[in-house]
């Protein structure tokens, strides 16, 4: 019995367990989000998306908000069309975090047990899954960058897209993407030096 569990837990195969984990994650986040009352910074993002013009969101608001405009631009269609504030904010956030968890479950090289437990840690489940902030989109961009990293030299556009996506969502993303670009560039330079 122990050997069977070990072979299952440390298997790197993707399949039913990942789908079940994703469904449980989605149901759990939806349930907790139903009882979550948005915090002031969540409401502020919505108010900016509702009241700001596209020009203000792109060129003025990022200067005092401290992060790039993509999160506000994502919220704009819902806010401007008069969609219910709390429901729309939760749906947008849950959508991006569910995509992020799907990338984690179906593209990561971790053993099955770790993959199936990771989505339920405090940050991925509550801080990023329930509280509607740009971190849900930032998490998706991190996981996409990690998924595309092994093939970055053969298919660089996917990797560059994930880094650009990272830069457009949050100031932390700019720092991380910049660091990853420096590492990638140094790898390219070292490989060129090694060839010649």
Regions found by a protein language model. Name each.
Residues 1-29, 109-112:
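Start-transfer (signal-anchor) and selected internal transmembrane alpha helices
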Residues 23, 91-116:
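Transmembrane-helix motifs of polytopic, lipid-linked glycan transferases
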Residues 26, 113-125, 139:
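Transmembrane and membrane-interface helices of multi-pass
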Residues 46-49, 61-91, 95:
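Short hydrophobic/aromatic helix or loop-helix immediately within or flanking a transmembrane segment
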Residues 193-195:
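Conserved small/polar residues in nucleotide/adenosyl-binding loops
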């Amino acid at each position: 019995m122990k050997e069977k569990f070990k072979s299952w837990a440390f298997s790197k195969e993707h399949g039913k367990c990942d789908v079940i984990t994703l469904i449980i994650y989605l149901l759990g986040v939806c349930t907790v989000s139903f009882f979550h009352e948005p915090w002031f910074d969540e409401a502020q993002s919505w108010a900016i998306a509702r009241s700001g013009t596209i020009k203000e969101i792109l060129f003025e608001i990022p200067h005092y908000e401290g992060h790039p405009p993509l999160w506000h631009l994502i919220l704009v269609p819902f806010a401007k069309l008069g969609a219910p504030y709390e429901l729309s904010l939760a749906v947008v956030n849950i959508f991006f975090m569910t995509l992020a968890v799907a990338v984690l479950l179906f593209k990561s090289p971790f053993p099955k047990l770790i993959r199936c437990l990771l989505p339920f840690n405090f940050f991925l489940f509550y801080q990023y899954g329930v509280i509607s902030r740009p971190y849900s989109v930032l998490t998706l961009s991190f996981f996409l960058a990690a998924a595309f990293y092994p093939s970055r030299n053969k298919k660089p556009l996917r990797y560059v897209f994930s880094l650009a996506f990272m830069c457009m969502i949050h100031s932390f993303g700019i720092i991380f993407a910049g660091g990853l670009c420096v590492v990638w560039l140094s790898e390219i330079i070292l490989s060129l030096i090694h060839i010649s």
